[in-house]
């Protein structure tokens, strides 16, 4: 019987831990966890996403601050805001919503956030800490951190002897996911668009993670029977059966057919997606604990 991971349920349990840790930190040291979100411009999707982050932060008991700047904001003004947030001791996490409007240089802004406040885990310092196995002081990018919660809950903390294949080598997901699996003692292969015999490589995986943005690319005959399959893809495809011009969301994995082979699988939607905001909250409360000299919670 295949287990379909309910991402909303797992995310809710992460949020519960965040709430408890936030309250305990405030009680023990008087520190209220603080998250600042910066959004530039008026992209509706970005505003919706930022709104949900702000609501979740308040629900967790955080001090939640949103800075909304016009689309024509100058680079130096945005940099000055980030510098002020870096210097603000009541803010433990800073998130700049991407993409930024042109011609703003998003990379320069992201790298200017103090690594200990970089709750998106995108700074080169945090990437370097992950690459060297320093999970004690680094912050991990939210989506791979969330996918890793699924892996740990399925296989435990130690992945010794298990083969993991990550399809996708992006800095945002593929590389950090591979590092997390490696840190947990898995034997890791990173596959990508230039990989030969991709299906054959995937068939060797006890843990298969797909993150390439190719709708339903991973078929049943790519998957080792009994494998754990984590689908990070979010693709919108035509769904004429539901009406003219209608679309539906699918992952990088052909869910129905792969479900018949895998032992554990994440759906799209409702799998990895809900974990991203949950892990943003987790990173923020971890950052607050470190600043206060307290041991952060484990997720």
From Swiss-Prot:
A single cellular component GO annotation: cytosol
Top-level taxonomic group: Bacteria
SUPFAM superfamilies: Aminoacid dehydrogenase-like, N-terminal domain, NAD(P)-binding Rossmann-fold domains
Pfam families linked: THF_DHG_CYH, THF_DHG_CYH_C
PROSITE patterns linked: THF_DHG_CYH_2
The protein's annotated pathway: One-carbon metabolism; tetrahydrofolate interconversion
UniProt keyword Oxidoreductase present: yes
Reaction it catalyzes: (6R)-5,10-methylene-5,6,7,8-tetrahydrofolate + NADP(+) = (6R)-5,10-methenyltetrahydrofolate + NADPH; (6R)-5,10-methenyltetrahydrofolate + H2O = (6R)-10-formyltetrahydrofolate + H(+)
Keywords: Amino-acid biosynthesis, Histidine biosynthesis, Hydrolase, Methionine biosynthesis, Multifunctional enzyme, NADP, One-carbon metabolism, Oxidoreductase, Purine biosynthesis
Disulphide bonds in the chain: none
One GO molecular-function entry: methenyltetrahydrofolate cyclohydrolase activity
PANTHER family per UniProt: C-1-TETRAHYDROFOLATE SYNTHASE, CYTOPLASMIC (PTHR48099:SF5), C-1-TETRAHYDROFOLATE SYNTHASE, CYTOPLASMIC-RELATED (PTHR48099)
Biological role: Catalyzes the oxidation of 5,10-methylenetetrahydrofolate to 5,10-methenyltetrahydrofolate and then the hydrolysis of 5,10-methenyltetrahydrofolate to 10-formyltetrahydrofolate.
Family (UniProt): Belongs to the tetrahydrofolate dehydrogenase/cyclohydrolase family.
Alphabetical list of NCBIfam families matching this protein: PRK14186.1 (NF010783), PRK14188.1 (NF010785)
Assembly behavior: Homodimer.
Protein name: Bifunctional protein FolD
Species name: Rhizobium johnstonii (strain DSM 114642 / LMG 32736 / 3841) (Rhizobium leguminosarum bv. viciae)
């Amino acid at each position: 019987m295949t287990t379909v991971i309910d991402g909303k349920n797992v995310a809710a349990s992460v949020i519960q831990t965040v709430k408890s840790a936030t309250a305990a930190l405030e009680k023990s040291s008087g520190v209220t966890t603080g998250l600042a979100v910066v959004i530039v411009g008026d992209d509706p999707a970005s505003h919706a996403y930022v709104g949900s982050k702000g609501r979740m932060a308040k629900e967790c008991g955080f001090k939640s601050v949103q800075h909304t700047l016009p689309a024509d904001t100058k680079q130096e003004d945005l940099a000055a805001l980030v510098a002020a947030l870096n210097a603000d001791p009541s803010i433990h996490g800073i998130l700049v919503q991407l993409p930024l409007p042109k011609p703003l240089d998003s990379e320069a802004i992201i790298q200017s956030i103090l690594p200990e406040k970089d709750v998106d885990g995108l700074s080169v310092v945090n990437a370097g800490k992950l690459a060297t196995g320093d999970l004690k002081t680094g912050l991990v990018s939210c989506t791979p951190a969330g996918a890793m919660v699924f892996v740990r809950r399925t296989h435990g903390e130690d992945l010794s002897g298990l083969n993991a294949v990550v399809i996708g080598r992006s800095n945002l997901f593929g590389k950090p996911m591979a590092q997390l699996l490696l840190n947990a003692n898995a034997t890791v292969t990173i596959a990508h668009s230039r990989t030969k015999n991709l299906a054959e490589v995937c068939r060797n995986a006890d843990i298969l993670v797909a993150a390439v943005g190719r709708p339903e690319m991973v078929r049943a005959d790519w998957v080792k029977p009994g494998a754990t399959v984590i689908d990070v893809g979010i693709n919108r495809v035509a769904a004429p059966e539901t009406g003219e011009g209608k679309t539906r969301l699918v992952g990088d994995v052909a869910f129905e057919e792969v479900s018949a082979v895998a032992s554990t699988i994440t759906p799209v939607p409702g799998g990895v997606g809900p974990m991203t905001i949950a892990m943003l909250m987790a990173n923020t409360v971890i950052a607050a604990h470190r600043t206060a000299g307290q041991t952060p919670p484990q997720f």
